Amino acid sequence: MSATKNPVLITGGAGFIGSNLADRLASDGHDVLIFDALRRPGVERNLRWLQARHPSRISAVTADLRDEQALADAAKDAKAVFHLAAQVAVTTSMVDPIDDFEVNIRGTLSLLEAVRRHGQRQGRRTPVIFASTNKVYGDLADVPLELVDDAYAPVDPAIRAHGVSEARPLDFHTPYGCSKGAADQYVLDYARSFDLPTAVLRMSCIYGPRQMGTEDQGWVAHFLIRALNGEPITIYGDGRQVRDVLFAADTVQAYVSAWERIEQVKGRAFNLGGGAANAISLRQLIAHIEYLMGRKVEVSYGDWRAGDQRYYVSDTRAARHALGLAEPTDWKRGVALLAEWLRAEKSGRPEAAPTVEAA
């Protein structure tokens, strides 16, 4: 447990986004308490990296979201909470929906209650910023699409120009979509019902350094790592599905801005991604990887996954305005930077990896 009186608590803080956020906050002079079960590949390495960079700023608790007492103890003195820990794989939720429920819904509710009760006793209102997902909008099957340059694109010119906005009705698909969607709504309702300063960021596809490349940790890094290792890539679907991608440093800036502006944005949900300018198909990403590597990549195709969207691009206008966000990193530059970082990690020279600030 942290010896610091009022740390920033990051659940899932040893993960990809969490470790980038922890690094930024510690660099800004905040003490950070990481709450993480350390079950996913690579997270122990992220934690060691953080503790080596910030030995006096980073402390950690190894525990599961389902451990209510450990969660309550971690939240007790926090001056802010970034809730990133979750069961994140649609495929895993299909195999064990109850485990998915316990982690994503019960764990989130336990955290909210711990923050609320400690706040009542101590006479303070602790901000909670929650990492949600674009999956809360369902499979978007009602959005007419057409093929444009070997990628799906909406027929509706407004959606094509800007993406999917927060006005889109929620439509939970798969156990994962249901659990994250319910957690999303609980976080928002605690602002309405209990005046807890909360905000929700519904993330699209995030990529960047400290992403370890398993499929559920992000397909951009997964594709890059397999390509760098000379291994084949499997695409589920036809590869024409489109997502907007956002670089890690830009994502971290959005979380920090949400905390800094929490009184202005409390009770609101924002779509967070690279937006229409950074919308790419899986095939387009592979073509760019081949360009960066100077050789072809072996690709095979599997069946579509349950609930997979043919098209999802975030309309980021609300987030950019409310959070004061700059234009994000161009995806081609970001993918090249991630490839450089992965090469440095693979060579055992992490100090050679690039350090990138938000665009």
Regions found by a protein language model. Give the residues of each.
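Short, solvent-exposed loop/helix junctions and linker helices
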Residues: 11, 102-105, 176-177, 213, ...
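Short, surface-exposed alpha-helical segments at coil->helix boundaries
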Residues: 44-47, 184, 221, 283, ...
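N-terminal Rossmann-like NAD(P)+-binding domain of SDR-like oxidoreductases, especially those catalyzing
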Residues: 1-204
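Glycine-/small-residue-rich active-site loops that bind phosphorylated ligands and cofactors
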Residues: 39, 66, 89, 100, ...
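NAD(P)-dependent short-chain dehydrogenase/reductase
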Residues: 140-162, 175, 185-259, 277, ...
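Activation loop
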Residues: 46, 89, 216-219, 223, ...
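Residue-level recognition of oxygen-bearing side chains
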Residues: 70, 80, 99, 106, ...
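C-terminal substrate-binding subdomain of Rossmann-fold SDR/epimerase-dehydratase oxidoreductases
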Residues: 21, 27, 59, 63, ...
